[in-house]
Amino acid sequence: MKSCMEIMLSRRSTKKYSDRMPERCDLEKIVEAGLWAASGRNMQAPVIVAVTDKEIRDRLSRDNAAVMGAMSDPFYGAPCVMVVLAEKTAHTYVYDGSLTLGNMMLAAEELGLGSCWIHRAKEVMARPEWVEWIKSLGLPGEYEGIGNLVVGYPDGDFSAPKPRRDGRVVWVE
């Protein structure tokens, strides 16, 4: 089994997926990792909406593409989308949701699944039809979309990692 550091160093954003849905137990492990992310004052503001329904997934993709001004699938064909929302009442909700997404990406890597953080959840989830959808899920409160994590089996190989840029660490001793 890979160490945590090995997982962090091997993870890449997957931009091409097979249409095979990951096993439910693996998706549940990814969600569990997200739920255990650190959060400001332990408010646990993020909520994860795991979407495996193809019709909803395709609507999310279409609306995300419209916000981006693109015609292609911004979810790269991934069959599962995990929408991370967060309660806006928590002062650290954006940071908390970001940590949730990070934990989930690392969990996907450990399980041999590909993942990619897709932006524009804020804009899509602010649309009236998606605000109503959030309410229909039984989520009380006011939520903001933090990010979408697409998850699936990679279709193809990964390129070698790019070197890290210099000058990004300063030690004060």
Please place each PLM-identified region on the residue numbering:
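Acidic, surface-exposed loops and disordered segments
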Residues: 1-173
